[in-house]
């Protein structure tokens, strides 16, 4: 007998884990007990590995359930309910196929187990055929080794693909971080623009305060002008009282002249009868002395300029008493002198009549002006009615638009209810799917063989990769949408800038036109003033020359009358010229009134724009509420989908869309701020134009006051001349005085009309002041609205920061989920490797019942199993 031992060695290396498996087996008849112990240990290891595998499968099934729920939710948000039902049907069919496959695999596994048992029994019975079987097993082990190596290479390729996917995901994350950084930079730029807008607003408020101060100064100047106007009216009343006093003086002088004529007739009778006339003359002298004393006592204060003439009369009367002969000659000389004075007074009265005719012509012109102003007033009333009709129409349109908005809101609420109903149905379907998946997981737990499990894991990996790719495609689609929205935003911004440039050009053209018109008006006023001054100087010179000629040409009265008529015609022509200049000035005033009407229409347009701004503000508030609702929904979704990577991608895309919507809202707010600033600038320009108009009107008022003062000086000169004429007037002046009185009444009526017109102008000025106050109030309201918009922008910035923080938190959660998934994958791979090793060891051990098994554990994680088989033979 000699003992023969055969030793076989099997080595296998796993590149993924760095562990080597070496199997040495031989035949030993005395090692069965130890082999059974090792088999027991290996079976226990197998059971522990199976338990670990089942636990991993449970966790994996939970993760798959969560993945399916998330994919269903994504499909609910992106697609419609029909697509979801089709996908569910497809998944049900796939689940049925998988169940059939699992049942087939289970049957096959049972059959293989039974077959292995039979083989084990046959191996125990037939010990001699073990060598051939060992050789066959060796060949099989070589084949299995090749298979394992191929599987290892496949697993390495999968690891490389996973690493590539990881790099791609990291690149996408870096891109997203770069986009977030760019968005932060944009937000900082927007904050800077908001700060600039606030500074511009403060500057506008300062300018507004300065304009208010200027308006206050203008009010003070208007009050001073009104005070001067009252003083001028008082002066006119004083002149009227003086005229009445002069009329009374004139009537007294006429009575005195009549008495003098009676005395002349009595003196002629005395010449014929000297003796009788002496007594009568003495009586008349006594009467005349008494009358003269009475007249002297009455009119000493009133006729200081005519005291010399009264004294001459007294001396002449004394000479009559002393020397009758000399008195007759003196009386004749006096009569001739009185006739000359009468002729001179008549010429002066004719001059006064001409002046009064001029005054009547001026009164007629003023009446025409009044009629024109009434026509203008009627036109303005008609325009005001038209504007009121337009305002009512716009209000009706506004109401219609508000009703349409309410309808749209109602439809939006209906759609939201439908969306909620669809979400409920999708949740029900998700629950059904979860139940089906739980059943599928129960079926999976029955599977014991590792190869089928590896295939299933590979399929699940492919599904995860497909889901990851789908998420990547969705992210790319969202990025394309974002780029398209940014392009549209840039296009709209460019369009708005073009419109603003066109409006600014139109405003500049209008400003230039108004400046040209104002310069033309100033030139015309200057020309009219120069012409008036030259004509007044020429008239003064002519009047002085005529007065000298009249004084020198007492003998040629008829020629002087003819010359006076000629001069009267010339003066009438000059008056017509002055009236034409006055009409031009009035036309310019009318143009100024039209410009005021234009400014009022602009103010109405500005009020309409303010109403539009309010409507836009309401829309912005509604958008803000909608954004808050969307934010709440997003928060709910984020709380639901914090543990899953796919949900992170969907939530991230939603947050990006919401951020773009908020960015659009912020751009709209910025545009509204810019539009409000432009409107404030327009208001300041219009206030400046009204200020210039007020200055021009005040200048015109001052010019009119100077003209009025010159006319008052002329009236005073005329009054002095009238006093001289009345002092030297004789019989025949009553009718002239009556005419003068009627003319003076007409002049008084004209003065009253002028007062009334002045009162109307004051009313217009008050209305303008009221309008300026309204504009200031509107400006303050605009500032308040700007402040509200700024507060809204601050709130939006805060929301953006919250969204950023939530995105960062979700990214952290996604990274945690990725690490967990990778850890589970590593554990699964390790468990699969251990199961493969255990199964291979069992197969070899069951094939060889006479074997001696030794195991050793390397600290690096490798496990070595030594099987030694010995065979004895007798020679």
Swiss-Prot record:
InterPro entries tied to this protein: Myosin_tail, XRCC4-like_C
Span list, region Nonhelical region: 1-28, 855-874
The protein's assembly and partners: Homodimer.
Region (Disordered): 110-143
Name of the featured protein: Paramyosin
GO cellular component: myofibril; myosin complex; myosin filament
Compartment list: Cytoplasm, Myofibril
One Pfam family named in its UniProt record: Myosin_tail_1
Coiled coil start-end: 29-854
Purpose of the protein: Paramyosin is a major structural component of many thick filaments isolated from invertebrate muscles.
Broad class of where this protein is predominantly found: cytoplasm
UniProt keyword annotations, A-Z: Allergen, Coiled coil, Cytoplasm, Motor protein, Muscle protein, Myosin, Thick filament
Family designation: Belongs to the paramyosin family.
Keyword Cytoplasm among UniProt keywords: yes
Cell membrane recorded as keyword: no
